[in-house]
Amino acid sequence: MKTLENNFLYLVVLGGRAEKANIELHDVRWVVGSKIEDTYDTLRKDWFGSSRGLHIDSYKKIQYIDGYKINLINVENHKIEKSN
């Protein structure tokens, strides 16, 4: 497994429009990148609404949760076992 030392986990709140919506809509996404700008293509691709007017309302680099450090590891080519 490869550690992603220069990448970080970001929690992002997106805002934008969607067809038939009368107000701005929001979505929350988790993305990985070395800086927030590296995540823009993924965020655009995953947005369900119109790309016109899509914007980031807020984001946070997540490095620690409840006293635990977040380490990103690439498991793309490894089987992940489900725990019961």
Question: Where on the chain are the PLM-derived regions?
Answer:
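Short aromatic-glycine-(Arg/Gly/Cys) micro-motifs in beta-strand/loop hairpins
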Residues: 2-27
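Extended intrinsically disordered, low-complexity coil regions enriched in Ser, Thr, Gly, Ala
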Residues: 21-57
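Generic structural motif
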Residues: 17-19, 36, 67
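Intrinsically disordered, low-complexity segments enriched in small/polar residues
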Residues: 13-14, 31, 65
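Short, mixed-charge low-complexity intrinsically disordered segments
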Residues: 47-84
